[in-house]
């Protein structure tokens, strides 16, 4: 259910784009992300850092898109967000000795420290590659194809990555 909740602004962006175009879709994404943060704050009293970062990036890049009437800003937004996640994972691990993937998933999984480090690095690399893929699509395909990639391509890549990661992790999980 959380996965669908996380996709909420992207799905609304997609629908608004198909009906009204990129600029209305951008405004819808900003409002949807604000609503998402407000709901999480109301419901749980604590908003994850990743959601705050997502809100900041959509407000800045979405706002620039609307103010300057230039869709390139919203098209760059996923790349900036993915690269910030990648940098955050790597900086936390190597500058502050904190493994953010372990912090997020450590209550659900018991893994050796080197495995957590590999998992953290895998997620950082995955986000870096997604950022590059987004730029490739932005510069080589139509706006409509980019919107389809943003919803279906990145979501599909995420699902495949999680499945492959889960298969890899099974050899480290103890029978309980």
Curated annotation (Swiss-Prot):
The chain crosses the membrane at residues 3-23, 24-44, 49-69, 72-92, 121-141, 149-169. InterPro entries: YciB (IPR006008). Signal peptide: none annotated. Its main location: membrane. One of its GO terms (cellular component) is plasma membrane. It is found in: Cell inner membrane. It is a multi-pass membrane protein. Keywords: Cell inner membrane, Cell membrane, Membrane, Transmembrane, Transmembrane helix. Plays a role in cell envelope biogenesis, maintenance of cell envelope integrity and membrane homeostasis. Belongs to the YciB family. This is Inner membrane-spanning protein YciB. The gene is yciB.
């Amino acid at each position: 259910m959380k996965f669908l909740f996380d996709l909420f602004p992207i799905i609304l962006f997609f629908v608004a784009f198909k009906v009204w175009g990129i600029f209305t879709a951008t405004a819808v994404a900003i409002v949807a992300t604000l609503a998402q943060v407000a709901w999480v704050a109301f419901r749980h009293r604590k908003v994850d850092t990743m959601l705050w970062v997502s809100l900041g990036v959509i407000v800045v890049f979405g706002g620039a898109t609307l103010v300057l009437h230039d869709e390139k800003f919203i098209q760059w937004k996923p790349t900036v967000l993915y690269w910030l996640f990648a940098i955050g994972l790597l900086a936390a691990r190597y500058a502050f000795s904190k493994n953010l993937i372990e912090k997020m998933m450590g209550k659900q999984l018991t893994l050796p420290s080197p495995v957590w480090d590999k998992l953290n690095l895998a997620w950082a690399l995955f986000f870096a590659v997604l950022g590059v893929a987004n730029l490739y699509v932005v510069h080589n395909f139509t706006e409509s194809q980019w919107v389809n990639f943003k919803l279906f391509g990145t979501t599909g890549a995420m699902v495949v990555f999680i499945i492959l990661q889960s298969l890899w992790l099974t050899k480290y999980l103890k029978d309980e």
